[in-house]
Amino acid sequence: MVLDLDLFRVDKGGDPALIRETQEKRFKDPGLVDQLVKADSEWRRCRFRADNLNKLKNLCSKTIGEKMKKKEPVGDDESVPENVLSFDDLTADALANLKVSQIKKVRLLIDEAILKCDAERIKLEAERFENLREIGNLLHPSVPISNDEDVDNKVERIWGDCTVRKKYSHVDLVVMVDGFEGEKGAVVAGSRGYFLKGVLVFLEQALIQYALRTLGSRGYIPIYTPFFMRKEVMQEVAQLSQFDEELYKVIGKGSEKSDDNSYDEKYLIATSEQPIAALHRDEWLRPEDLPIKYAGLSTCFRQEVGSHGRDTRGIFRVHQFEKIEQFVYSSPHDNKSWEMFEEMITTAEEFYQSLGIPYHIVNIVSGSLNHAASKKLDLEAWFPGSGAFRELVSCSNCTDYQARRLRIRYGQTKKMMDKVEFVHMLNATMCATTRTICAILENYQTEKGITVPEKLKEFMPPGLQELIPFVKPAPIEQEPSKKQKKQHEGSKKKAAARDVTLENRLQNMEVTDA
């Protein structure tokens, strides 16, 4: 995921100042641009010198051949005149005055200079890339410039009644319909582990079927993706911070052969966007085949580092969930990708409108965008039981930022193009099932249970097509369990012990002062 290097090169029509300004608007380090420009300039000088040295090496070989053809004496003198050693003034005439043995020595010295130059070039290339991959995509002009998404995300439009309040939050409702095992899930899988069961399994499957049918009717190709990716491929679709904060690493045998003890490093996907982005890696996509639209279905795995204490109960923010994703490869020409961007968010809006979920669309501030996104719109549903808007959909246009590193090119072949172009790539959530279930539970709650949304009825089993009944009391209204009481008593004892310790310390201080 990188920008075009020519954007940093003034002699190629680039504008480093524009990229520096973009970094500032993203509230990221603009100094990365200057470091990249410096490394790139040195890299280009190094490559130019290496090219010249190779030409001189070829000239030496040619001159040796001519001298051998003329049967000139080889000689045994390996001394090299001072004017030749600089290589900068080395010409065919200068070589013609040397013995074959001397020219061979010059050629060896040139080889050493080439190796040194190549080592420097590789070092500069790595330095340049380290800066390049941490510089974000160019921003769309409509992106709000701010580093505070809680205050400055721009509400673009609202659909439905986003003021109504209801009694229970999704945290209680998943228990009331007996569709969730949280404590046992945590014992088995750790923090945020859960079992989805009973009626909520049917509701989840209904959402998956309805979302896939909706996208299929709009020309999307359903695709079920791998759940893990090779490290070298994941590096091309994920930014560096995701490896620390989001992705799970999987270590396994590198071969199916029993005597092979090598190990392979892979990563669980955080979204089907990642494997679908790599689906056409190293390919040329023909203009007449675009857009290519995929409806990705996968389980997603996220560490949620940095989310400690947020949404710890229920199924809204979990480490594992199912998701249907819109993913599109688009032409880079004629504003086609931005037209597709609007089409994709509209598709998501119509899906949630059909489910009767109130929402607003927000334009995400520049400081909260990931490196790849040129612009991102979120659909945040109204949760009447929680009294808050919660994110259900993110829709991003990454332009050619992802495609460049994945080498997904636009057109036929390089021979038919004046300059290599890259396709534009877009992604948008259609339905993250656990979050959408939470939204349905809060919006469709009644005194007796959850009314099934009209569009999902045909996908639900007999007996559950109209109402999902409450079968358990709301946890918020229950007496504390024995375990909870024990934990509460333990907390009280610890607090009392701290108070006694503090009092003793104060008394000791008084004695000392006296």
UniProtKB/Swiss-Prot annotation:
<keyword id="KW-0436">Ligase</keyword>
<feature type="site" description="Important for serine binding">
    <location>
        <position position="429"/>
    </location>
</feature>
<feature type="compositionally biased region" description="Basic and acidic residues">
    <location>
        <begin position="479"/>
        <end position="502"/>
    </location>
</feature>
<keyword id="KW-0648">Protein biosynthesis</keyword>
<dbReference type="InterPro" id="IPR033729">
    <property type="entry name" value="SerRS_core"/>
</dbReference>
<keyword id="KW-0539">Nucleus</keyword>
<dbReference type="GO" id="GO:0042803">
    <property type="term" value="F:protein homodimerization activity"/>
</dbReference>
<keyword id="KW-0805">Transcription regulation</keyword>
<feature type="binding site">
    <location>
        <begin position="302"/>
        <end position="304"/>
    </location>
    <ligand>
        <name>ATP</name>
    </ligand>
</feature>
<dbReference type="GO" id="GO:0000049">
    <property type="term" value="F:tRNA binding"/>
</dbReference>
<dbReference type="InterPro" id="IPR045864">
    <property type="entry name" value="aa-tRNA-synth_II/BPL/LPL"/>
</dbReference>
<dbReference type="InterPro" id="IPR010978">
    <property type="entry name" value="tRNA-bd_arm"/>
</dbReference>
<comment type="pathway">
    <text>Aminoacyl-tRNA biosynthesis; selenocysteinyl-tRNA(Sec) biosynthesis; L-seryl-tRNA(Sec) from L-serine and tRNA(Sec): step 1/1.</text>
</comment>
<dbReference type="GO" id="GO:1904046">
    <property type="term" value="P:negative regulation of vascular endothelial growth factor production"/>
</dbReference>
<comment type="similarity">
    <text>Belongs to the class-II aminoacyl-tRNA synthetase family. Type-1 seryl-tRNA synthetase subfamily.</text>
</comment>
<feature type="modified residue" description="N6-acetyllysine">
    <location>
        <position position="323"/>
    </location>
</feature>
<feature type="compositionally biased region" description="Polar residues">
    <location>
        <begin position="504"/>
        <end position="514"/>
    </location>
</feature>
<dbReference type="InterPro" id="IPR042103">
    <property type="entry name" value="SerRS_1_N_sf"/>
</dbReference>
<keyword id="KW-0963">Cytoplasm</keyword>
<dbReference type="GO" id="GO:0005524">
    <property type="term" value="F:ATP binding"/>
</dbReference>
<comment type="function">
    <text>Catalyzes the attachment of serine to tRNA(Ser) in a two-step reaction: serine is first activated by ATP to form Ser-AMP and then transferred to the acceptor end of tRNA(Ser). Is probably also able to aminoacylate tRNA(Sec) with serine, to form the misacylated tRNA L-seryl-tRNA(Sec), which will be further converted into selenocysteinyl-tRNA(Sec). In the nucleus, binds to the VEGFA core promoter and prevents MYC binding and transcriptional activation by MYC. Recruits SIRT2 to the VEGFA promoter, promoting deacetylation of histone H4 at 'Lys-16' (H4K16).</text>
</comment>
<dbReference type="GO" id="GO:0001514">
    <property type="term" value="P:selenocysteine incorporation"/>
</dbReference>
<feature type="binding site">
    <location>
        <position position="271"/>
    </location>
    <ligand>
        <name>L-serine</name>
    </ligand>
</feature>
<feature type="short sequence motif" description="Nuclear localization signal">
    <location>
        <begin position="482"/>
        <end position="494"/>
    </location>
</feature>
<keyword id="KW-0991">Intellectual disability</keyword>
<keyword id="KW-0067">ATP-binding</keyword>
<keyword id="KW-0225">Disease variant</keyword>
<keyword id="KW-0007">Acetylation</keyword>
<keyword id="KW-0030">Aminoacyl-tRNA synthetase</keyword>
<dbReference type="GO" id="GO:0000122">
    <property type="term" value="P:negative regulation of transcription by RNA polymerase II"/>
</dbReference>
<comment type="subunit">
    <text>Homodimer. The tRNA molecule may bind across the dimer. Interacts with SIRT2. Interacts with METTL6; interaction is required for the tRNA N(3)-methylcytidine methyltransferase activity of METTL6.</text>
</comment>
<feature type="binding site">
    <location>
        <position position="302"/>
    </location>
    <ligand>
        <name>L-serine</name>
    </ligand>
</feature>
<keyword id="KW-0597">Phosphoprotein</keyword>
<dbReference type="GO" id="GO:0000978">
    <property type="term" value="F:RNA polymerase II cis-regulatory region sequence-specific DNA binding"/>
</dbReference>
<dbReference type="InterPro" id="IPR002317">
    <property type="entry name" value="Ser-tRNA-ligase_type_1"/>
</dbReference>
<feature type="region of interest" description="Disordered">
    <location>
        <begin position="473"/>
        <end position="514"/>
    </location>
</feature>
<dbReference type="GO" id="GO:0002181">
    <property type="term" value="P:cytoplasmic translation"/>
</dbReference>
<feature type="binding site">
    <location>
        <position position="427"/>
    </location>
    <ligand>
        <name>L-serine</name>
    </ligand>
</feature>
<dbReference type="GO" id="GO:0016525">
    <property type="term" value="P:negative regulation of angiogenesis"/>
</dbReference>
<dbReference type="GO" id="GO:0005634">
    <property type="term" value="C:nucleus"/>
</dbReference>
<dbReference type="GO" id="GO:0005829">
    <property type="term" value="C:cytosol"/>
</dbReference>
<dbReference type="GO" id="GO:0019899">
    <property type="term" value="F:enzyme binding"/>
</dbReference>
